[in-house]
From Swiss-Prot:
Belongs to the universal ribosomal protein uS19 family. Keywords: Ribonucleoprotein, Ribosomal protein, RNA-binding, rRNA-binding. GO terms for cellular component: cytoplasm; small ribosomal subunit. This is Small ribosomal subunit protein uS19. The keyword Heme does not apply. The gene is rpsS.
Length: 93
């Protein structure tokens, strides 16, 4: 169920302060954040965020196509190695 339009997009206050500060100073430094739940707003376009995935920080450069999505969507938390293959089928090849 999507968020109510009258509430507006959710963004953590501390992250919003960092975004405003980066926009005012014109600084292109990477903004480190643990806030995966924050929605990407148009003011974030062009900035780079280091989003924590539980183990390390993944750099995410925000583009116009990402507006409306969450920061956590672009920082995967699980590593997929593929399904286990049968040893017999590998031996035949």
């Amino acid at each position: 169920m999507p968020r109510s339009l009258k509430k507006g997009p959710f963004i953590d206050d501390h992250l919003l302060k960092k975004v405003v500060k980066a926009q005012e100073s014109g600084d292109r430094k990477v903004i480190q954040t643990w806030s995966r739940r924050s929605t990407i707003i148009p003011e974030m376009v062009g900035l780079t965020f280091a989003v924590h995935n539980g183990r390390k920080f993944i750099p995410v450069f925000v583009t116009e196509n990402m507006v409306g999505h969450k920061l956590g969507e672009f920082s995967p938390t699980r590593t997929y190695y593929g399904h286990a293959a049968d040893k017999k089928s590998k031996a035949k090849r």
